[in-house]
């Protein structure tokens, strides 16, 4: 039998332990994170995102451009590249991004930095180490207060068609479901530094104007006057070509809701400035490029989206994935803008919760502008120049299937794309086919971070 003193001591210890537990405050319940990769620092949320690709690319001709397809230089079937198939396995298209969001009084701030690995790399990149260089895709910040937004940084151009509103976020921009890093012919797009101002007078209407980085693009297919310095324009390898002022882009969007579906309609314009100088006459020449765009994303059923977009321009070819020149230079160094039109139509259908099928048809049409520099023909589309395209067309079909998709684990996707591309020059040498064609197959297994 335990002694009375020992029993009293045991009871006192138990009471002391109960009192201590009663005085210890219970830990406050923490809200579950919106994503396993969300980190809260101060009053800002840092979300790490992106995906990892294991991609196979097969082309019926040797385009020679790596993961992105250079549509404007598809080789002819009477050349060696036109008779050689291309096979490539790569993970260059993998992406990493960081999204930061915060509240600042009555305003909200968010910023995004995104990189992939399609930057310029060494010539022997595929020999041993496959050390692909990272590059900045997007890097912007947005300040929103009330009915107004301000965006600054490198973002999708305002001229690119939106799916809803005028948001710079990639899911709100029509970029297609394609795996090709050059997306889809007929789409208008660029990622460039800008200062964008957007107003939302109502839930269904948005209007914006953007001041964006310019670049006077002529490409390699425009023949310049013999005495004209190539450094005054971008011939595909002159990033420092001068521009008199930024590109000015405006857009209005209308997003009505019809039952459970939403529609999107928009109209946009672009104004661009070009300038050249002639040392022979000590004169400066100027020209203005313009373009008008109309786009729609129609949802006839909740699981189906119909997409249509077009850009009609006189001096806006750079925005057509660089497939068309902005202008040509005359013998006296004056400027003649070149007309070009792009258009794309497509359908995206979620046939099952885990499976989407998609298809697009896109085209780019480019006008011919030719002059003479003494006895030499100059401009775009001169006789016997197979690099000056009259039209380029692309038909695409594909499927996107999710093996699983869960916020805690991310998603594992199988995506396949088949495309047929045809380019038709204004003129070809004797014995050369009238057009060049290639077939593209892209297949990737993609893990999307949670």
Predicted features by range, described:
Residues 61-66, 122-132, 163-170, 218-236, ...:
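Outer-membrane beta-barrel translocator domains and adjoining extracellular loop/strand segments
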Residues 38, 84-88, 129, 140, ...:
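Outer-membrane beta-barrel proteins
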Residues 32-68, 78-225, 244-257, 297-312, ...:
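Outer membrane beta-barrel
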Residues 110-119, 213, 266-273, 363-364, ...:
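Transmembrane beta-strand segments that form the barrel wall of outer-membrane beta-barrel proteins
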Residues 250, 258-397:
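Detector for outer-membrane/organellar transmembrane beta-barrel domains
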Residues 1-30:
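Cleavable N-terminal export/targeting peptides
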Residues 41-43, 87-93, 129-136, 186-190, ...:
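Transmembrane beta-barrel outer-membrane domains
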Residues 399, 435-450:
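Outer-membrane beta-barrel "beta-signal"
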